[in-house]
A protein has these predicted regions:
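Serine-dependent carboxylesterase/thioesterase catalytic core
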Residues: 1-135, 181
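C-terminal catalytic-base region of ester-bond hydrolases, centering on the histidine
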Residues: 100-108, 113-239
Length: 239
């Protein structure tokens, strides 16, 4: 979020350009989870979860909160009006627990700046390194059993953001609720309140299918039409 804000501040410091007011975020798989965080309001949910999990560290958590505000308490990214999620495991995936996934996770490393910040934060809270159950790879945190993904799934999406879901299912047969794209189950990708939900017979790489591309174009085209109509209405009212 910080990087996006810095980019916008550089090219549009006054944030008066139309592109700064009608941002569309599109995220696939874990990118979809990150996209959701960018349009969510954490409130005190993350802090409360930490205090509930580690009551003995409650005072230290409150003491370090101001310094790590961007991690523990954040608001939706300013200017975003639309979010599109493709095969996003909002509630995790059981496949993250598989041995092959954990093997691949050993090669996944967070950026050094984030690792340093998290390391400093946990030292302040626990006076030692990260507790064993707190993992440092995105793959681990996508497990449906992971407490992190469970907390993040509870964060409310901004009312100012219209969001859409594009979901894959490997097989057209059987109940939709029991389907999966081979990696992410339908129940994890499904989001209540979505403006639309497009389910496509596809594997996890649903973003590569013609149906998904057509759906993306339709959403973006309709968004432009809506913005144009809104401008026209405002112009008429002004006259």
């Amino acid at each position: 979020m910080e990087a996006i804000n810095k980019t916008i501040d550089h090219f549009d410091p006054s944030r008066t350009n139309q592109a700064s007011k009608n941002i569309t975020l599109i995220g696939h798989s874990m990118g979809g989870v990150l996209t959701r965080l960018l349009v969510s309001d954490s409130g005190n949910t993350i802090i409360n979860a930490l205090e509930q999990k580690y009551p003995q560290a409650s005072d230290k958590i409150n003491q370090m909160d101001p310094k790590f505000k961007s991690i523990l308490r954040f608001k939706p990214l300013q200017g975003v009006t639309t979010a599109i999620f493709l095969a996003a495991p909002h509630q995790g995936t059981p496949y993250a627990d598989a041995s092959w996934a954990r093997y691949l996770a050993s090669f996944v490393k967070l950026p050094l700046s984030i690792v340093n910040k998290l390391g400093e934060m946990t030292l302040m809270i626990f006076g030692q390194d990260l507790p064993r159950e707190i993992n440092m790879t995105g793959v681990d945190n996508l497990s449906a059993k992971d407490p992190t993904i469970r907390v993040l799934a509870k964060l409310p999406i901004s009312r100012n953001v219209t969001y859409y879901s594009i979901i894959g299912r490997e097989n057209a047969d059987g109940p939709l609720e029991e389907s999966s794209d081979g990696i992410v189950p339908y129940w994890s990708s499904h989001l209540e309140g979505a403006a639309s939900e497009k389910v496509i017979v596809s594997g996890h790489s649903v973003q590569e299918t013609p149906e998904a591309i057509i759906e993306l174009r339709k959403i973006l085209r309709n968004q432009l039409v809506d913005q144009s109509s809104s401008k026209h209405t405002k112009a008429l009212m002004a006259n």
